Amino acid sequence: MQTSVRRISRAMSLVAMLLVPMLASVALAAAGDTPKSVPDLSGVWEVAFGSRTRPGPGIPEQPALTAEYAQKLAAFKAAQAKGEDVESPQANCVPPGMPAIMNQPYPMELLFTPGKVTIVIEAYSQTRRIFMDGRKHPDDPDLTYNGHSIGHWEGDTLVVDSVGFTPDTALGPSQGYRHSDQMHIVERFRLTAPQTMEVVTTIDDAKALTKPFSATKVLARHRDWDITEYICEQNNRNLSDDKGKAGIILTH
């Protein structure tokens, strides 16, 4: 009897030893562990010198606004023309949010860890977290400046899907182009050369846009760069020039 018990105990121990690495592998897979076959997009990147954001094929140069949001833009331009102190959140150290935060003239760093891609953006000390573990967007996401992002690989392309944006930010190219809390952004990151990356951004918003808007930009990788500290002056205020028009003064 004791011999049988020992045999059963040894068999159970062996099964447990075999299951541990199997369960670990399953856990890594569930966490979205990056396959070895995908390209290396890690490192510090900046918008390439001489590169400009350009619209995608067949897409208009400017976002096509609905009537409601076209009125918002017209009101903004009218106030601007009068020299009024129009809203300028960045003058008060409020981050621009998506998609503008990805178009700043400051570098950003892409960090890859199991189940997650983290983008550290020097401008306004912003961080984006892209979940690669297979999760879905929340049914009712909190509205934030950079939204809720999930991602996956399509061949050699990192595809990032983001929702849940506060309507307090702008689409660009100016603060007059507003969006709603229904804005949906899809980004496609792809290497076109060892140190060059193309990012295609497509924006859809049923309330603010009559059709999706797409733009492409090129980034250059700098292997010897580091992200540095970015401090926006506390309690900053909009300033007016000698003609009474709103503006900001940059100092260093």
Map each language-model feature to its residues.
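N-terminal secretory signal peptides that target proteins for export/translocation
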Residues: 1-11
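Bacterial N-terminal signal peptides
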Residues: 11-26
